């Protein structure tokens, strides 16, 4: 069991071997635990997302976060599926690009600091 008070203002890093950005569970963790930043590392690079000073009303609970991300996925999925169907991208690229686009749009809409750092 995590000792949440000890994580206050910490930067928590974990890996995503698939190369994708943050999951819904990652965002809910950022909301639930008093860390300042969450990072995910893959062989291509890393993503970061920083908690806002105050969570907007629209995403101030786990259920609201889940529903919001579900709606964003529904909005963006056709674009990436179309690229995949036209063989412009492969399955791995589709996953990586789609997951990044979903969290990028989520962050832009709700004022979270999000970005990617490419390695090497």
Q: Model features per residue range: what roles?
A:
Residues 35-120:
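Divalent-metal-activated hydrolytic enzyme cores
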């Amino acid at each position: 069991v995590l000792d949440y008070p000890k994580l206050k203002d910490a930067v928590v890093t974990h890996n995503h071997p698939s190369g994708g950005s943050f999951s819904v569970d990652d965002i809910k963790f950022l909301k639930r635990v008093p860390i300042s930043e969450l990072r995910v590392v893959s062989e291509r690079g890393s993503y970061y997302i920083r908690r806002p000073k105050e969570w907007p009303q629209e995403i101030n609970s786990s259920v609201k976060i889940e529903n919001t991300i579900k709606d964003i996925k529904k909005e963006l999925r056709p674009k990436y599926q179309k690229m995949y169907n036209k063989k412009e991208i492969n399955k791995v690229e589709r996953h990586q690009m789609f997951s990044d686009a979903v969290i990028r749009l989520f962050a832009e809409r709700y004022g979270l600091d999000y970005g990617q750092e490419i390695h090497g």
